[in-house]
Amino acid sequence: MFQKQERIGLVVYLYYNRDARKLSKFGDLYYHSKRSRYLIVYINKNDLDTKLEEMRRLKCVKDIRPSAFDDIDRQFVGNLHRDETNNHQKG
């Protein structure tokens, strides 16, 4: 049966857009901004350390930033109520 794998998104900044094809072997290319010269690449979390190390060694890569999606609070129920109580306590 299909098992869901934990994945993480990486924002990879490039020096030149022509080097985007070189990064397709590391994971799934989700988006390529030709104007801002960055890619969004999704890779498996268990391969993160090895693939990140290999990607940083490439001369075409300027910078790599991991996605902050896991750090964001996605519990939306009651967010407005929490904000109202925090504002009343401050003021």
Curated annotation (Swiss-Prot):
It holds the Pfam family DUF2129. Keywords: Cytoplasm. It comes from Streptococcus pyogenes serotype M28 (strain MGAS6180). HAMAP family: UPF0298. Belongs to the UPF0298 family. This is UPF0298 protein M28_Spy0318. Coiled coil: none annotated. It comes from the Bacteria. Its main location: cytoplasm. One of its GO terms (cellular component) is cytoplasm. It is found in: Cytoplasm.
